[in-house]
């Protein structure tokens, strides 16, 4: 029976007799004495086999190879001073083996050496195909442990401190195609009918509030059949929460406590509270994006009023067409950002055009506030306009002003992208800094130009602000997103809980009453039986852990992730199925493989 885990042994365990199990991480024969690093999920410890002490264990050790599964019995000893290893927690001790039992060997050549630093250079496709080997690596093991710790911290806070109840909601439910495409599951017992895998437990958690559960949470599995997008998974995990009888501010305060508790428990970091708040309008005005990275400045400045009557048609024409002109003021940019980077073919030009802009206009502020720019701008701005630009942007000698002109969405999108690129170039982003904030007061709806209708910006169950309820198309929502260093960590809202308001929202997004009853009749009926005021939030667990682990991809914090093409290289899912299975489900495939 195991007495200890490998990574738990310390100097306080010296002279204890222990039984360990694990994998051979490294193996070395030093002139008759064999050393092996034994690894389990907690870490590594050095095993020593000396033929002068235990000939039997030495004979077994001589047959060891990397990744053999073994059992070791022995005594914990203090390492000699010259072999202390401060790089690992067990570096003060080693185990003198009394016996070594090989439980299993390795019968094929390893696709990569797990204990080698070169394993980091292995192609991701190989790592995913042999994921069970990849997960043996220290980095991946630590990521899974971190994920476990985050979930445990969430549970302890919600259950022990806030009286939440964990409730499971169905995985097989009905399709309500309002967001991404559903994953559909045919029903064998109800021919011609289909289940959908949930994109979120949204409706069920609201029904739990109608049921009187009061405070609900779930570590929920969710599914979205989205087009191929970098770093998205077709199945993902979220912390899902809903609570009754709580105000907007009370919900935000409770969630700040949750996130602060996770940081303190998992990283021993104290997060200051309350979190700053920005309205959606403020975020778009200052940063051009509704999830701003506030670890650095470089705020955008709207100069539409200054240039609306200028002779430079790019500026004046944009304003007259209902668009805007904004500036990204960049201090001390002279020796870092060249004109070549701004002009066609340059790095910043490419970033702006990829975001939809046609190009970038610029002005450099030289000594005595002289402007260095193209003649078309310099000759078509009055002295008064030039002075107003300098004053409004706070520009000083050495500043570079990057202009975006056009429709509001494109200008904001392109300048927001440039802001991040420039922030990195100037070294303004502190990777160790943690900035958490709320963005609130989102629009209820956005215009879908393709379908020529309004659609819910978040989802159609979000409550409008009371003062906007009589003008729903232009209403602001009682919604809130938590932003972590420019990435959305979670989002939620107060919910609609009156049937008449819910019906008005459905009507606003173009759902007829018949369609609304067909898709959401069970919810509308529930609202007739005493529904409490309620609200909730959901956090993307995969992304949260990725940020805490400082990983670049969420695939590195998920045990068995899918590729960008939504396939599993380990199991080769999705796969074809037997014709008999399709026949039982009354399904005929129309897909014709390419010959």
UniProtKB/Swiss-Prot annotation:
Would the keyword Oxidoreductase turn up in this protein's UniProt record? no
Ligand binding (L-aspartate): 178, 224, 458, 495
Q: Which GO terms describe its molecular function?
A: aspartate-tRNA ligase activity; aspartate-tRNA(Asn) ligase activity; ATP binding; nucleic acid binding
List the GO biological process terms: aspartyl-tRNA aminoacylation
Locations listed in the record = Cytoplasm
- Mind listing the UniProt keywords for this protein, alphabetically? Aminoacyl-tRNA synthetase, ATP-binding, Cytoplasm, Ligase, Nucleotide-binding, Protein biosynthesis
Question: Keyword Chaperone: yes or no?
Answer: no
Q: Which parts of the sequence bind ATP?
A: 224-226, 233, 488, 540-543
> According to its UniProt record, which reaction does this protein catalyse?
tRNA(Asx) + L-aspartate + ATP = L-aspartyl-tRNA(Asx) + AMP + diphosphate
| Residue stretches in coiled coil | none
**Where would you say this protein principally sits, based on its record?**
cytoplasm
Q: Which Pfam families match?
A: GAD (PF02938), tRNA-synt_2 (PF00152), tRNA_anti-codon (PF01336)
Q: Which PROSITE patterns match?
A: AA_TRNA_LIGASE_II
Q: Can you quote a single GO CC term?
A: cytoplasm
Which enzyme type, at the first EC level?
ligase
Quote the CDD domains the UniProt record gives: AspRS_core, EcAspRS_like_N
| Enzyme Commission designation | 6.1.1.23
Q: Where is this region: Aspartate?
A: 202-205
Q: Where is this site: Important for tRNA non-discrimination?
A: 30
Tell me, how does this one assemble? Homodimer.
Main function: Aspartyl-tRNA synthetase with relaxed tRNA specificity since it is able to aspartylate not only its cognate tRNA(Asp) but also tRNA(Asn). Reaction proceeds in two steps: L-aspartate is first activated by ATP to form Asp-AMP and then transferred to the acceptor end of tRNA(Asp/Asn).
Q: Which family does it belong to?
A: Belongs to the class-II aminoacyl-tRNA synthetase family. Type 1 subfamily.
HAMAP family (alphabetical): Asp_tRNA_synth_type1
- Protein's UniProt name: Aspartate--tRNA(Asp/Asn) ligase
| Naturally occurring in which organism (per UniProt) | Gloeothece citriformis (strain PCC 7424)
